[in-house]
Amino acid sequence: MENYIVLPKTADQTLLAKYYSLADVFTICSKRENFPTTCVEAQCCGTPVVGFDTGGTKETSIVPQDDFVCYGDIDGLAEKVKDKFCKSFKNIAEKAQKEYSKETMTKRYMETYDRGGRKERILLIDVNCKGSSTGKIVYDLYTNLRADGRTAAICYGRGENIEEENVYKFGLDWETNIHAGLSRITGYNGYFSYFSTKRLIKYIEKFNPDLIHIHELHAYFVNIKPLIEYIKAKNIPVVWTFHCEYMYTGKCGHAYECKNYQHECGDCPAVKGYPKSLWFDKTRQMFEMKKNLLGNWKFTIVTPSHWLADRVKTSFLKNKDIVVIHNGIDTNVFHPVDASDLKKELKIPGDCKLVLAVAPNIMSESKGGKWVLKLAEKMKNENVFFVLVGAL
């Protein structure tokens, strides 16, 4: 009998809270993460976290112990898991909920917005709304800003149409598909979506924000240069949250060990990775475009981790105002809950310790499901059961 089960991804946050509450240990084996929300969600449900020390993962840990090992160190990870089995973590949920609530996150963002005076009209831009990790953050900010008496709007490029006040999908799905195709053919990304970008600029003009808060601009839904040139020409203050490294590399969301971005991209070792080019390497041209566009512009960068802030400081954006604000989650959902029914449903032996891993597309190279299965194999003679959530 296998000591693991691989389950499909789910957007049901109540179900995810049950998974987290059921587990004795949560593990993350991603190749690179900036500030993984799953680790935060697990701890808010009372479950300690271990994993690979890749990027900002260990910054998520509430427990002041070194519970992260080098990438690929399965022996070390197994020892960390067993160590967690032997200890009690009674206050971990309370501490995590205080630090990582969406209310705490919003308060810190508002303090950043309000330098030089309170900003009443805030416009948030992201690839998504509600339907992704960044989309959830944007929607939480929108909700809490409105609760604070401000006027907030969301402009997003991809996903379902959402019928709420000042929530606007400017992206045209057909144009997004064309953008993705042209990017693969030409090697350029963030250079197309002419009509979608015009729609976004028109909305900004109409809304007349006191401040724009940008999140992700990759994923084939906006033409970056004319958007930023418009914002600069209008002299609108900007806070920009970097959830990845895309805006200071030629094209990569995660540069991993590559240091080309510290001087000049080109001859990209990841040219066929997302965002993919089939034939042409245009990373030098895209790097120069971003450097010229952003280099002399005054705006505030927010990163969710100190690790990512340190990476920004090695790029051409090193002299910008850089603030660290941890991602927040909905602690009304993510808190310890009774998951006994789920344990029965999954047919997990009652006396087993349970190790959980959750990630979108968890079996992909970047999310590290294969390492979790190697950990399960390593611990097959232990009374431990592994649950992996996030298979496509």
Where are these regions (language model features)?
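Short hydrophobic beta-strand element within catalytic cores of glycosyltransferases
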Residues: P48-G51
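Aromatic "clamp/platform" in nucleotide-sugar-dependent glycosyltransferases that forms part
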Residues: K31
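Conserved acidic donor-binding segment of nucleotide-sugar-dependent glycosyltransferases
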Residues: V63-I74, K82-C86
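A short helix/loop element that forms part of the nucleotide-sugar donor recognition site in Leloir-type
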Residues: H335-I348
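Conserved donor-binding/catalytic core segment of Leloir-type glycosyltransferases
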Residues: I348-K367, L373-A376
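Nucleotide-activated donor-binding/catalytic signature segment of Leloir-type glycosyltransferases, i.e.
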Residues: M1-T10, N383-L392
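Short alpha-helical donor nucleotide-sugar binding micro-motif in glycosyltransferases
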Residues: K18-A23
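A charged, aromatic-enriched C-terminal amphipathic alpha-helix characteristic of glycosyltransferases
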Residues: C86-G117
